[in-house]
Amino acid sequence: QNAGIATAYQEVNLCTNLSVGENVMLGHEKRGPFGIDWKKTHEAAKKYLAQMGLESIDPHTPLSSISIAMQQLVAIARAMVINAKVLILDEPTSSLDANEVRDLFAIMRKVRDSGVAILFVSHFLDQIYEITDRLTILRNGQFIKEVMTKDTRATNSSA
């Protein structure tokens, strides 16, 4: 985190017994003279959610009551709290349906457009071609090659 690198994993790594806002701000809660200022903490969480277009999520909502897809977006909002320069998303679409993937990609584009580099790990080639600028191919953990995604599209459409 100190290096500006944040991660969101395939299996959502959040605390289901906490609220959305508490998860977003975990470890970065706003403090007052008598400890954590929950009002300011939830206000800050709301700000981070809004930056990602997630104004509809109430930070007081129990995390356990929202869908896995929404939890994935909360995990990304949590990553943004540290002002990440790089966001690593490890198989974030593996348990999402097509509509949820579309929503996630819209959020990813917002994050990217804010200047954050995104490393998107996936086995779904159609998603890779849709969302990435550059493609790095690994086989058995070994680097094979790196190409610009746009340079592969002509090959893929004719295959």
Tell what function each PLM region has.
Residues 1-159:
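Glycine-rich phosphate-binding loops of nucleotide-dependent enzymes
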